[in-house]
UniProtKB/Swiss-Prot annotation:
PANTHER family (UniProt xref): FLAVIN REDUCTASE, FMN REDUCTASE (NADH) RUTF
Gene: hpaC
Key word Cell membrane present: no
Family under the similarity heading: Belongs to the non-flavoprotein flavin reductase family. HpaC subfamily.
Name assigned to this protein: 4-hydroxyphenylacetate 3-monooxygenase reductase component
Organism per entry: Salmonella dublin
GO biological process: benzene-containing compound metabolic process; pyrimidine nucleobase catabolic process
Length: 170
C-alpha cells in the first residue's frame, strides 16, 4: 500500500470514530482565536488534565502557545453553526466569530461559550510534535458545567446531535 493510500485509509477509518465537537479558544497578549476540534480527550482526573491535538500547520498554534492558556468548549446539539464558523466552513472572520453575544470571559480570561455543555479553562503544560500535529497537554484550572442540552458529535464527516432519551417515570 502506498503512503498516500494508507493515509487516506487511516483518515476514512478515523471518520468512523464518533467524537465530541469542541471549540478550543484562547485569549491573551498573543491574541484571540479559536478552532473546532474533535481530537480532544481526558488524560487524568488527578490532576484534571486534557489532551488537545491541532494540525501543526494551523495559524492558531503560535497564539495558543503565546498565551499559554485555553478553554475547551464542549458543544451542545444546537451549536453546530458555531462549530462550522470555527472550522472555517462559513468564511466568517475570526474576530467576527467572537463578536457574537454568546461569549463571556472565564475566570482565567479565556473565551467561554455560553450554553456549551462544558467549558474547561486551563494552562498549557506541555506541547509535543507528533507527525503532522501538535499535542497540547492542558492542566485544567476551572470547569463550567451546564445541566441543559444534548451532545454534538462528528461522525462520517458530518455533524450529528446526540440526544438523551427521557427516563420513563417509575
Amino acid at each position: 500500500m502506498q503512503v498516500d493510500e494508507q493515509r487516506l485509509h487511516f483518515r476514512d477509518a478515523m471518520a468512523s470514530l464518533a467524537a465530541a465537537v469542541n471549540i478550543v479558544t484562547t485569549a491573551g497578549h498573543a491574541g484571540r482565536c479559536g478552532i473546532t476540534a474533535t481530537a480532544v480527550c481526558s488524560v487524568t482526573d488527578t490532576p484534571p488534565s486534557v489532551m488537545v491535538c491541532i494540525n501543526a500547520n494551523s495559524a492558531m498554534n503560535p497564539v495558543f502557545q503565546g498565551n499559554g492558556r485555553l478553554c475547551i468548549n464542549v458543544l451542545n446539539h444546537e451549536q453546530e453553526l458555531m462549530a462550522r464558523h470555527f472550522a472555517g466552513m462559513t468564511g466568517m472572520a475570526m474576530e467576527e466569530r467572537f463578536h457574537q453575544p454568546c461569549w463571556q470571559n472565564g475566570p482565567l480570561g479565556q473565551p467561554v461559550l455560553n450554553g456549551a455543555l462544558a467549558g474547561l479553562e486551563g494552562e498549557i503544560s506541555e506541547v509535543q510534535t507528533i507527525g503532522t500535529h501538535l499535542v497540547y497537554l492542558v492542566a485544567i484550572k476551572n470547569i463550567i458545567l451546564s445541566q441543559d442540552g444534548h451532545g454534538l458529535i462528528y461522525f462520517k464527516r458530518r455533524f450529528h446531535p446526540v440526544r438523551l432519551e427521557m427516563e420513563a417515570p417509575v
